[in-house]
Amino acid sequence: MAVLGSWTAQRCLWENGGRSLLRAVAQSGPCCSHQAKRYLLTDDILKLHEFQKKKLATLYQIYGKKDLYFQMIEDKLQRNGIILRDELKTLLHLCSTQPDVEFAKRVIYRYHAENKNVMFGEFRFGPVFLRLCYELDLEDIALDLLKDQTLRGFFSDCTSFNILMDMLFTKGQYERAVEVLVEMRNQRVRFSKDTYILAFAVCYKLNNPNSCKICTTLLEEIEMTGDLLPKQAACFAAAFALKQNEFQRARTIYSKIMNTDTKLCNNLLLLIKVHTSTMEDVLHFLEAATGTTGSILVKKLEFSEEVLASAGQKLKSQAELHTRFNSVYQRLKNEGQISALTLDQMLCYTSPELRHTNAHLLRNRKISHRTFRSLQSTLLVE
């Protein structure tokens, strides 16, 4: 009971008076406070919605017995007992506060020490732990564990690294995201399509000599291996080259994009033309965009106000061309083809159909599928 007492005391200090366990999770249930500002990875990769569902299912199964479960695991740690795979899975899905995660860290170290030379099917704990850290804004803990040499092999999948890079990217911690990328390379974890997207996005945001070297190295590696540069990664790389005033390089990168029929690609192309083509060519491009048939079935090109301003600035010294530009600008405006979005916002935009909110899990579902009773009377009350 001494073990239980110390654990309970610790949790009470952290949880401000011992709120109901399920109410605590319900309050953090739309647990992605990042949802409105999350940019790059979709829920198909992050799987936060699926993770939240599993958490609620686990909490429902042992409702009222979380302390006892944590006591049982603590007792195993004290007795040097073997931590089973399903026990760690359950533990991670029960965590709802930072002290819970701190306790889970101890269990992870023990579990990995016991099982680092044993494979248990295809299950990987790394992504589960990273989703937990993403949910609770614990990027410091996630980064520390990911870089810890004693846990080599625990985070052996690219998804764990991608989730952490995405978390750091949304928080503007670009230098630390580079640390994750370097650590991923040091641990010889194979880069995925999403890794490249995140890597070029971070380089674009940093816009410094070091990120320029990283970007160049990655582009050279992709060229050597013959891999296909993901479209979103290519857009970031081209935009980064424009930031660096390497206009021909931006044009070369852009030429590798297979499908350019998007608002982002059209704006990138316009900006590249502004810096590499004649102003006559730029005007022809814009005039062609206003010359559509008017059919609702034909998608009209849409341009960023910011990018158009760059084009207009270039034409200021040429009165005749600038007059033509103003005429085209007015036609685009009248047709609703000018967007307030900046190029940066277009780059960091995730399509709505690929973005799922986690909040609806608790907000929309009011009735239990099993009992047809209100969830207010079961899961969410003290």
From Swiss-Prot:
The keyword Plastid does not apply. This is Pentatricopeptide repeat-containing protein 2, mitochondrial. The keyword Mitochondrion applies. Transmembrane segments: none annotated. PANTHER family: PENTATRICOPEPTIDE REPEAT-CONTAINING PROTEIN 2, MITOCHONDRIAL. InterPro entries: mS27/PTCD2, Pentatricopeptide_rpt, PTCD2, TPR-like_helical_dom_sf. Belongs to the PTCD2 family. Keywords: Mitochondrion, mRNA processing.
